[in-house]
């Protein structure tokens, strides 16, 4: 247990930050999974809709500081390549 007031505060902040990061990490994983599944099924319309949602959500995570801009661009780019490969 923390002995200093500042250490107690940091412990509280860490708990909040961990919960927030867990939420975004799970959301990112689920969004990516939805796009990949739609692309694997060959459903172009569903894949495009999922890609739009993914693009918006991933860039929102950038603005909140969860992931870096380049990481977001790379993820969206790779998902877009998958969707564009569908005939």
Curated annotation (Swiss-Prot):
Disulfide partners: none
Origin species: Campylobacter jejuni subsp. jejuni serotype O:2 (strain ATCC 700819 / NCTC 11168)
Gene Ontology CC: cytosol; small ribosomal subunit
UniProt-annotated stretches for the region Disordered: 1-20
Entries under HAMAP family matching the protein: Ribosomal_bS20
Gene: rpsT
Pfam families, A to Z: Ribosomal_S20p
Listed GO biological process terms: translation
Function, as annotated: Binds directly to 16S ribosomal RNA.
Family per similarity comment: Belongs to the bacterial ribosomal protein bS20 family.
Keywords attached to this entry: Ribonucleoprotein, Ribosomal protein, RNA-binding, rRNA-binding
Name of the protein this chain belongs to: Small ribosomal subunit protein bS20
GO function terms (MF aspect): small ribosomal subunit rRNA binding; structural constituent of ribosome
């Amino acid at each position: 247990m923390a002995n200093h007031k500042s250490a107690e505060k940091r412990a509280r902040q860490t708990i909040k930050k961990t919960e927030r990061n867990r939420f975004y990490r799970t959301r990112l994983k689920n969004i990516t999974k939805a796009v990949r599944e739609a692309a694997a099924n060959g459903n172009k319309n569903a894949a495009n809709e999922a890609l739009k949602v993914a693009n918006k959500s991933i860039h929102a995570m950038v603005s909140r500081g969860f992931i870096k801009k380049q990481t977001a661009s790379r993820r969206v780019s790779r998902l877009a390549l998958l969707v564009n490969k569908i005939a």
